[in-house]
From Swiss-Prot:
Keywords: Cell membrane, Membrane, Transmembrane, Transmembrane helix, Transport, Virulence. This is MFS antiporter QDR2. GO terms for cellular component: membrane raft; plasma membrane. It comes from Candida albicans (strain SC5314 / ATCC MYA-2876) (Yeast). It comes from the Eukaryota. Disruption phenotype: Leads to defects in biofilm architecture and attenuated virulence. It is a multi-pass membrane protein. PANTHER family: MAJOR FACILITATOR SUPERFAMILY, QUINIDINE RESISTANCE PROTEIN 1-RELATED. Residues 1-14 have a biased composition (Polar residues). One of its GO terms (molecular function) is transmembrane transporter activity. Residues 1-41, 97-106, 156-169, 220-278, 333-370, 418-438, 484-504 are cytoplasmic. InterPro entries: MFS, MFS_dom, MFS_trans_sf. Residues 63-75, 130-132, 191-198, 300-311, 392-396, 457-460 are extracellular. The chain crosses the membrane at residues 42-62, 76-96, 107-129, 133-155, 170-190, 199-219, 279-299, 312-332, 371-391, 397-417, 439-456, 461-483. The gene is QDR2.
Amino acid sequence: MLSTTQSVTEPTEVTSKKVEDIEKENDEETPYSIFTSYDRLVLIVILSLIGFWSTISSPIYFPALPTLTSYFHTSSSIMNISVVAYLIFQGIAPTISSNLADTFGRRPVILASIIVFCASCVAISQTNVYWLLAVLRCIQAAGIAAVISISSGVAGDVCTRANRGSMVGAVAGLQLVGNGIGGLVGAALISSFNSWRSIFIFLTIGGGVTFILAIFILPETSRKLVGNGSVVPKNILNKSPYIYLPHFKKRMNNDITTIVPATRFDLLGPLKIFFQKNVFCTLLPVGIHFAAWTMVLTSLSTELESRYHYSVMHVGLIYLPQGIACIAGSLVVGKSLDWYYRYRKTIYDQEVECLPLDERPQFNIVATRLTLSVVPALLMIIGLVIFGWCIQYKRHIISIIISTILVSFSASVFIAICTTMLVDLYPNNGSGSTSCLNLMRCWLAALGAGVLDSMINAMNVGGTYTVVAGFCILFDLALIYVLHNAKKKFSNSGPTTTKSPPKQ
């Protein structure tokens, strides 16, 4: 159950009160954020670009696996260790670095992440031994993985619940484009330059250009440092040239009353959130959906080469529709989250307007968000079954493309929905709470990638993805438990403030 006892990590009554009091839309005197729609668009673009290099770094590696196996004179099973290790570190690192971002600011941690990423890519492009490649891939993952969860923290800083869905959905969806088209980019680079090293040179150049852009246009948004954005940060690392642009500077009135009280750095903070029952039961379905998507991406290249005898470049082109599906998902889920929030909030306001303040239940934000997860959950299951059996019986390629579109679209939408809900529950710890999601999805993806070959050998492709679809159904049932507990918690709780109706 979502506990109502006071805790630094749980969305308590006290925390909820702060959220309700702070998240006021368009208050003329003290707006929740001075970031306009234009400023949020700039943030969406730069955060999506930064996160793109995190998500593309795993699948861009897949087309190079046969080449790397030959180059390092090793087996495919040994080479797959580098894939699994990458996913493990991609899950672990953000629980530390994203927590640093919640404490010391978003901007310096993001910039440091890009530096580590670029340095590791340069080193990988020059390595000649397998063990060093595997180690450097772990460093690469640890460096860049945190930017995904930090992006969600930024959304919590500058958006209220009413418009948060659009930003989280757009950023999460656009970032996951890298996951969808990574195979295409990797195949194109290998075909064009006939070298696996070109992949990491490409990542270095892309990361370097993004770093330069981030220096100039990525502002600090942590409410513990800049409040609603109107306070100039004290540390030079948190200062961005963007805040000195005339259109932004004129809104900076140094309103220190909007600064959220700082909390001490808690290394285990994200893990405390992770092991809360409701959070854990929300993360399980997200993790299995992402793991299923990763397994599809992994199987796609090997199965199309072995069963359909496609070239590396031809296989790469099959990844393109998945990237388009991610973009479509980001657009659909963001607008849907905001629309459904307004719809449910209107109904709630009508239901409680005649009740005394001390009898009004809290608005059920958990149900408002998770209700929309039903459709992508069904699409994921359908896509997995179609993919597995169409591959096994060598059906027309269009059926496989359609199935991968369903899987990619549903995974990106499902992740965005649950990410938004976590930020809603922990608006002042958005990066840390979202790192829990990253931890679960990466660890389950690592497990899925590790057992994929054994599953296919034991039950063929069709049976494998039918079983994976079954796991998705089983894990999705955990959301029923979450919704049941949320209904009890929000219906039994009192108002968030005794002075005015709760604002969402």
